[in-house]
């Protein structure tokens, strides 16, 4: 079992911890708790870079080793880092579990050292018709992020 963690930081009062685990070459399970967000859906993605020197803006685009368009987690045509939305309750918190086979913790396309980003708006899953739908899901600003680091 390989495990990883990302501790979210934010200039907007958002905080949280995201845990990743993978057994063998099976799918990766992502569990998280995030607080300080407005209620509703928020885009949730793995971005290509683990660089937070300029806050969440320096994490680069969505992790996309196959060079595909943005999409929903269940789509064949999607960025590997497209994890859809997290649902935030009226109290500003979200607790979630996501299982995904395109974000391994080992191998050539490992997400270790990359960043996880929570966005300010819902991800339209590439289907919104907006000019940004096929690249970012039109998910708005980057309100929190953390670098995915290996856990012992």
UniProtKB/Swiss-Prot annotation:
Zn(2+) binds at residues 62, 70, 79, 82. SUPFAM superfamilies: Cu,Zn superoxide dismutase-like. Destroys radicals which are normally produced within the cells and which are toxic to biological systems. Keywords: Antioxidant, Copper, Cytoplasm, Disulfide bond, Metal-binding, Oxidoreductase, Zinc. Binds 1 copper ion per subunit. Binds 1 zinc ion per subunit. InterPro entries: SOD-like_Cu/Zn_dom_sf, SOD_Cu/Zn_/chaperone, SOD_Cu/Zn_BS, SOD_Cu_Zn_dom. The keyword Membrane does not apply. Belongs to the Cu-Zn superoxide dismutase family. This is Superoxide dismutase [Cu-Zn]. GO terms for cellular component: cytoplasm. Its EC number is 1.15.1.1. Disulfide bonds join 56-145. The gene is SODCC.
């Amino acid at each position: 079992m390989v495990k990883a963690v990302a501790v979210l930081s934010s200039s907007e009062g958002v905080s949280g911890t995201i845990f990743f685990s993978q057994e063998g070459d099976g799918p990766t399970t992502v569990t998280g708790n995030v607080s300080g967000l407005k209620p509703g859906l928020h885009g949730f993605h793995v971005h290509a870079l683990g660089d937070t020197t300029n806050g969440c803006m320096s994490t680069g685009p969505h992790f996309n080793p196959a060079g595909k368009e943005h999409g929903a987690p269940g789509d064949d045509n999607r960025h590997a880092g497209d994890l859809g939305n997290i649902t935030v309750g009226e109290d500003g918190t979200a607790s979630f579990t996501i299982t995904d086979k395109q974000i391994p913790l080992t191998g050539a396309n490992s997400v270790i050292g990359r960043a996880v980003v929570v966005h300010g708006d819902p991800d339209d899953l590439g289907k919104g018709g907006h000019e940004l739908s096929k690249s970012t899901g039109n998910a708005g600003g980057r309100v929190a992020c953390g670098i995915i680091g290996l856990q012992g």
